[in-house]
Amino acid sequence: PIKSSAASDVYKRQPYIYVLILAVFFLFVDVLPEDTTDISLLVLLIIAVIYNLYSFVIVIVNAVQTARGKLTAGQAARMNLIIKGIQIPAYIMHFILGFIGLAMSVWGIGFLLWAVLIDLLTILLTGISSIGCSIRMRKERLVSLPGAIFMGIGCFIYCADVAIAIVYVVKARKKSPAK
């Protein structure tokens, strides 16, 4: 079994931390006087930026450590699949919010932009993490160099990233069958 790392814990919370921050914000926004609403929006934005920078640093550290050999190819492949699988409910939620924004015409542009930006941020973070897995798979000779490059790029494409994560797990299992 894979030991939980800071990076995988961040991924598990990533899609839902925004919902939590927004829920707390909307609970208290009506309580605040009108002149402080702008300040509270700024605080919300600062919290989101800090959290995303933290996530970005953790993702890069995780990718580098995986590429250097902290995890075996099998462990990296399983962690990659878990990370990609956990993002699926978030993608569905963002799609629904984007669709609601699209249905709202001009008034829904904010929903639509939010859904697109959060999806792009999420796929960027999970894709960067997958690069470490691609490198580890190549170093352990489980995939060819062109295959590692192709799959590394594919980890930044919606739906293809989950399929590639499954391929990584299957290839890692073929190398070391279950004991």
What do these predicted regions represent?
Residues P1-Y11:
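Single conserved hydrophobic/aromatic residue that forms the stacking wall/gate
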Residues K12-A23, T37-N52, L112-L121:
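Alpha-helical transmembrane segments
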Residues F56-M79, L102-V106:
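Membrane-helix interface/capping segments
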Residues V59-V61, L120-E140:
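Alpha-helical transmembrane segments in multipass membrane proteins, preferentially the mid-helix core
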Residues G74-H94, I149-I157:
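Transmembrane alpha-helical segments of multi-pass membrane proteins
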Residues M93-G110:
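Alpha-helical transmembrane segments and their membrane-interface junctions
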Residues G127, F150-V170:
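Hydrophobic, aromatic-rich membrane-embedded alpha-helical segments
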